[in-house]
């Protein structure tokens, strides 16, 4: 294990500080390291593996398509793209979809769409369009996505970033109201903040944002890359407040844990600002990606993983709420997406949980984030709870 870590560290760029653990195999909700030790995966690649590791249905779809046709680029039609587009548009109740690859790429595309809509439809002077984001957000680390962040540590050394962005406190509707100007084209938010620490907004907040957008002719963009596709016990986390955004951004679990697939979805009145040449993606919507993503969506539906997430997530949250320890500040969550916020450094607790076979990670120093594959079973949930009880008892 040490030699693998040393080799990787020697050649890798220094933009990650991974746990000193080498994973070699994954199946369902479990992974194994090079020593053969088994872990319940409560990271899931940050919600990439919602369908579980190496799901046989998705693997089968991948291998069959890979042996037939992998890529032709979007200068031609493929025989599976339209069917996938129909499936995902019906799921999101949107007219159009832009297929892409990584999550941050989809955020970049959404920014472009919002800006062009702002100038072409709302009539804002080109170059004056504004987008409002939330403090403690995480939309990615490419230049446009980074411009939406309020974290100076992420942005330092990368200026100048995009102009025309503002951030306000997540959950503060008065602050958001004050930030809106005639040049505001879009408000972008994660319905539940993931990297920010599983932050759930006050009840009614998302509805109030929707009302503001309607009042001021502003696009509401929901970044559901991490929280969508069943993670919170709903197909989309926006459903917790019965709010429909103007733009959905999806990713991570859209590729079934096997391939990078993302998407931007909107209705005709928004998506029509894109015309040939205004945007493109060489790998976006390639036949292999589409075969995998189609299977990934089918698995979520056919195995009722969204409902499973809500049911088992509720069970896990109730069990964790029984934990009593002076270090625990708050435990919160929706579905199988749970944050345990401490009033001290979470890293030592994470280390002890990993020793007990629970693979997890801290975020923002004091928060333990849990996001196991949605295929996890009740026995594995009980093992997670037992490990937490043991760690906090000792």
UniProtKB/Swiss-Prot annotation:
Family note: Belongs to the class-III pyridoxal-phosphate-dependent aminotransferase family. OAT subfamily.
Reaction it catalyzes: a 2-oxocarboxylate + L-ornithine = L-glutamate 5-semialdehyde + an L-alpha-amino acid
A Pfam family reported for this protein in Swiss-Prot or TrEMBL: Aminotran_3
GO MF entries: identical protein binding; ornithine aminotransferase activity; pyridoxal phosphate binding
Localization in the cell: Cytoplasm
Modification N6-(pyridoxal phosphate)lysine occurs at: 252
GO biological process entries: arginine metabolic process; L-proline biosynthetic process
Annotated InterPro entries: AcOrn/SuccOrn_fam (IPR004636), Aminotrans_3 (IPR005814), Aminotrans_3_PPA_site (IPR049704), Class-III_PLP-dep_AT (IPR050103), Orn_aminotrans (IPR010164), Ornith_aminotrans_bact (IPR034757), PyrdxlP-dep_Trfase (IPR015424), PyrdxlP-dep_Trfase_major (IPR015421)
Gene this protein is translated from: rocD1
Keyword RNA-binding: no
Cellular component annotations (GO), alphabetically ordered: cytoplasm
EC numbers, comma separated: 2.6.1.13
Function: Catalyzes the interconversion of ornithine to glutamate semialdehyde.
Translocase listed as a keyword: no
Main location, first listed in the record: cytoplasm
Organism superkingdom: Bacteria
Keywords from the UniProt entry: Amino-acid biosynthesis, Aminotransferase, Cytoplasm, Proline biosynthesis, Pyridoxal phosphate, Transferase
Organism: Staphylococcus aureus (strain MRSA252)
Name the UniProt record assigns to this protein: Ornithine aminotransferase 1
Cofactor: pyridoxal 5'-phosphate
Top-rank EC class of the record's enzyme: transferase
UniProt pathway annotation: Amino-acid biosynthesis; L-proline biosynthesis; L-glutamate 5-semialdehyde from L-ornithine: step 1/1
